[in-house]
């Protein structure tokens, strides 16, 4: 609970504000594997797909039903109740209202619930892609590493290759990779993301 409260209460980083300014008045969509509140504080929920879950929700650990529950208030109550031995009263442990199993944060794990909310996140993204398939589209990849390239990086590569007027930009100080097949449709920027976004906002007036 303490760790999750630190994550959920963390101040929004400046790069998120800069990105928000850059994208203002543009036709955009955000695909993220981040599970915190950084994006949802600044961008409308309908323009975000959090495909790896969200710390703001609980699910049943046994996945007995397709339901998600707000976790924020409960997490703060648990955090306040932690004693000097780092324990909380047993009766405060959140339990499933259906089967009584312990509740689990709705984030990627062995028991991650890929139910209605999960499908909605993918449906929103797919609807945006289909609507814009024949338009000029920029796939901007920010900070994707080599641990889970299958969620954002590889789909962006495939979509850039397939879409006629697509272009791909990856910004990463270490893992900015550009496939050979995208050498004429992409750009790898091996720089600090915060600096690139700040410079983009400063020198282009938010235009990108």
Describe the function of each predicted region:
Residues 1-208:
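Conserved catalytic alpha/beta core of Sir2/sirtuin-type deacylases, generalized to analogous enzyme cores
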């Amino acid at each position: 609970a303490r760790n999750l409260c630190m994550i959920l209460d963390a101040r929004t980083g400046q790069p998120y504000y800069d990105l928000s300014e850059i994208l203002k008045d543009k036709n955009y969509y955000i695909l993220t594997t981040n599970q915190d509140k950084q994006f949802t504080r600044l961008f409308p929920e309908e323009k975000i797909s959090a495909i790896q879950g969200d710390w703001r929700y609980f699910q049943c650990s046994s996945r007995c039903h397709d339901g998600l529950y707000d976790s924020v208030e409960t997490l703060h109550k648990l955090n306040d109740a932690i004693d000097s031995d780092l324990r909380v009263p047993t009766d405060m442990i959140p339990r499933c209202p259906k089967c009584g199993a312990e509740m689990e944060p709705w984030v990627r794990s062995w028991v991650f619930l890929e139910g209605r909310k999960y499908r909605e996140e993918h449906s929103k993204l797919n609807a945006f892609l289909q609507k814009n398939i024949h338009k000029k589209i920029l796939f901007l990849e920010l900070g994707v590493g080599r641990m889970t390239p299958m969620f954002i990086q590889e789909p962006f590569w495939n979509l850039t290759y397939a879409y006629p007027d697509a272009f791909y930009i990856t910004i990463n100080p270490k893992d900015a990779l550009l496939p050979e097949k995208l050498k004429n449709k992409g750009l790898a920027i091996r720089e600090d993301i915060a600096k690139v976004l700040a410079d983009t906002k400063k020198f282009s007036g938010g235009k990108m």
